[in-house]
Amino acid sequence: MAIKVSIDASGGDYGIPVTIVAGIKALNIFQDLHLYFVGNEPSITTELGKYPSNTLNSRYTIIHASEVVLMNESPAIALRKKKDSSMRIAINLVKTFKADACVSAGNTGALMAISRFVLRTIKGIDRPAIMGRMPTITGHTHMLDLGANVDSKPKALVEFATMGSIAVKHTENIESPTIGLLNIGEEDMKGSEKIRKAATLLKASNLNYVGFVEGNDIYKGIVDLIVCDGFEGNIALKASEGVASMMEHYLKQAFTRNLLTKLVSLIAIPVLKDFKSSLNPDKYNGASLLGLRGIVVKSHGSANIDSFLTAITEAYIEAHAKISDKISLQISKELEHNE
């Protein structure tokens, strides 16, 4: 059976020139994938006309949307006044089970607000959380929340850990993902009362909680999942992106300083390519909005074609694994157990 993914084609900084091409690439990679391209139909048709293929025509559907949620638009305006936006229609397709997942590079706040309104949260989950991948020396780790919730209570952090553990288990084929709680130290007495309380709850749970992790542990790959409040998580994410950008800048500067360094750079090209690839944000694009009654994946607003393709791939994998259903089932079991 085909995996169906709705694409907010008009969303993001670049819209249709990026989302459509990434979609065509995804269709060529995943033979059981069907895409709904949602956005301005004439513009989508024009873009698709650049990539004629008789074999792909039957594997995508164009759905017209007369409105677009702007990147600087308030979530309230997007929710109340733009009911025919490409974002809203793409999410509605998940609500009506026509699509198994949705991908958008649009406004994060609007995407979360519309997703919560249209799809609703899973019973037993107070608030959805955003989970993404972070590069490590061993490959990558997962982290949530990356910005959906500020000042989360201990119970919410445990919910994040539960949802994240299920998602990592079924998308990475890790039977019992290790979980760390982001803190300012590894000792039990370190951190705020909220963090210490969350640690106590996690220790008492059935999750594979291994203890506190510090900021410098994020990139060591010592755990499969790092749990934190959205405030700290978003800062860590942006700091990571900033450091990667700075390192690339310094390397360019160092290797173009004079003739000798330019010659050295020619010798070092293979190493530099591997280095750049390991930190390339395109490889880690596609953050999951966990806790909804449906799968929604958020792409970077400034995503290029390859980066948006990564987000589509994430949605495809989650849809195959039925992540939302598995989270719902586990939370339901826990609610029954606690009654």
From Swiss-Prot:
InterPro entries in UniProt: FA_synthesis (IPR003664), Phospholipid_synth_PlsX-like (IPR012281)
Extent of the signal sequence: none
GO terms classed as biological process: fatty acid biosynthetic process; phospholipid biosynthetic process
Alphabetized UniProt keyword annotations: Cytoplasm, Lipid biosynthesis, Lipid metabolism, Phospholipid biosynthesis, Phospholipid metabolism, Transferase
Keyword Hydrolase attached: no
EC number: 2.3.1.274
Catalytic activity: a fatty acyl-[ACP] + phosphate = an acyl phosphate + holo-[ACP]
A GO MF label: phosphate:acyl-[acyl carrier protein] acyltransferase activity
Involved pathway(s): Lipid metabolism; phospholipid metabolism
Any one cellular-component term (Gene Ontology): cytoplasm
Superkingdom of the organism of origin: Bacteria
TM helices/strands, residue ranges: none
Localization (cell): Cytoplasm
Keyword Lipid metabolism tagged: yes
Complex and partners: Homodimer. Probably interacts with PlsY.
Function: Catalyzes the reversible formation of acyl-phosphate (acyl-PO(4)) from acyl-[acyl-carrier-protein] (acyl-ACP). This enzyme utilizes acyl-ACP as fatty acyl donor, but not acyl-CoA.
UniProt cross-references to NCBIfam families, sorted A to Z: plsX
Entry's family note: Belongs to the PlsX family.
Protein name (database record): Phosphate acyltransferase
Source organism of this protein record: Vesicomyosocius okutanii subsp. Calyptogena okutanii (strain HA)
